[in-house]
């Protein structure tokens, strides 16, 4: 019997139940088996949008690293290098600053002595490498060993300094010693004690010979001889003038020496008093040092 549409109904299997058929169950099993394969393909070949996002993230990370490196370089060198500057030399704006050459060489690890530098230049490459390795190996020991060796070095340095201090100093020339003495003589006396046309007399440095300090012998004056006017000829007056000049010269020399001796003696008296006061102060200091040493010896034993 046909329905209104004129079509025919498909034949119905009388044994088929209301649930799904065997074809549907087989399709579900096929889908569950192909799911891991699809996931693996997606992981190996991601979509285009995901790849673009990943590439953009990588580029952004590289840009951030480059910006950080540039900021670090700028902070490390805030000023342009000196070879980029042009310094005009006009004699006024150019100022040369002081630089300690030894300190600069020490900071850069360059030997200061030319002998050491020449020795290193003449050495072959193998020996230089051996020296560098030896220096690195000596610098690498732990801090405990350095702490052990440092006191011995300090002790040896202190012992050498003590030996140098204990050595007897070289003798001092007494002529080079100057004592601080408040001595200001009268300038007029200095002029009278100076040789005319020569240097000004210096009582601090001037020294007399032994013959100058000896008392001069008394010379008896010759008896006066009366010469009448008739015998006073030209020869007589010439001899008389020569005698007067010689007498005046001897008197001036004697007075000059007397003035020099007087001023020099005044200075020596002042210097002697100053030296006596210094010696008294030194004796006091020596007495204090002796008391300190005696107290130390009574407490800790002899030195």
From Swiss-Prot:
This is Thyrotroph embryonic factor. Disulfide bonds: none annotated. Residues 1-63, 132-176 are annotated as: Disordered. Keywords: Activator, Biological rhythms, DNA-binding, Nucleus, Phosphoprotein, Transcription, Transcription regulation. The modification Phosphoserine is found at residue 32. The keyword Oxidoreductase does not apply. CDD domains: bZIP_HLF. The lineage of its organism: Eukaryota, Metazoa, Chordata, Craniata, Vertebrata.
